[in-house]
Each structure stands twice: as C-alpha cells, then as structure tokens.
Design a protein with these regions (language model features):
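Conserved short acidic donor-positioning loop in nucleotide-sugar-dependent glycosyltransferases
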Residues: 15-18, 37
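Hydrophobic residues in alpha-helical segments
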Residues: 14-15, 50
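A beta-strand edge to alpha-helix "cap/lid" segment located at domain peripheries
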Residues: 34, 40, 44-108
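Amphipathic alpha-helical repeat scaffolds
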Residues: 8-13
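Generic helix N-cap/helix-start motif at coil->alpha-helix transitions
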Residues: 2-4
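Short, well-ordered alpha-helical segments enriched in acidic and aromatic residues
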Residues: 17-30
Length: 108
C-alpha cells in the first residue's frame, strides 16, 4: 500500500524538479487522471503537464486511506491563478495508483 502523504510528496517533487521519475514509480501503466470537469488523461498526458512547471502542491491532509484507495486534500499554488484546494480520491492496486480523481476549488 502506498500512503497518501508519500505519493503526494512525490507528486510535488515531480512538479518542483520537472522529473517524472519521482511520481512514475507510484502510477500504473494504465493510470487515468480525471480532473474537475470530468476530462480523463492517461499516464503520458499526466506526465506532460506534471513536467511543464508553474504548479506546486502542499498542505497534504489524509482523510481515510487503505490498501485500495486514498482520500486526501492539498493546496495548489499555480502561476497566474488564485490559491486553490483539491480533494483527491485515488484507487490503487498492489501499491500502484490506477485512477486519480480531483475536485478543485479556487479562493474567491
């Protein structure tokens, strides 16, 4: 089982360094990322925006987690955008995340 805090720290390290290897080891080959609008990205598209820069995440809070899923929140700091908070629901199998869904809310 991969804990929420572990994968979120790896995700931020990827955003900071633009090096996807920090995060890639936690994601399955058939990984899907679903954004707030319901748009789905595969592993390659997720890699593209992760290594593009201009985005950081912090203030990780785990709600529940177990060997099958995590639910957590984190803040987002993105160049040119107001501060925002994200709710994450993610599913994992054998320590690799297969699905990651976010709901993002911006400060007014």
């Amino acid at each position: 089982m991969t804990q929420a805090n572990t994968v979120l720290k790896a995700w931020d390290k990827t955003l900071e360094t633009k090096d996807f290897t920090h995060l890639e080891k936690y994601l399955s080959r058939d990984f899907q990322f679903e954004d707030t609008t319901g748009e789905l990205d595969n592993l390659e598209n997720t890699k593209s925006w992760c290594v593009a820069g201009g985005l950081r995440i912090n203030n990780f809070k785990t709600i529940p987690e177990n060997e099958n899923y995590i639910v957590a929140t984190h803040d987002v700091i993105q160049e040119g955008s107001p501060k925002s908070n994200v709710l994450v629901y993610a599913e994992q199998t054998n320590g690799k995340f297969t699905y990651w869904k976010i709901q993002r809310a911006f400060e007014a």
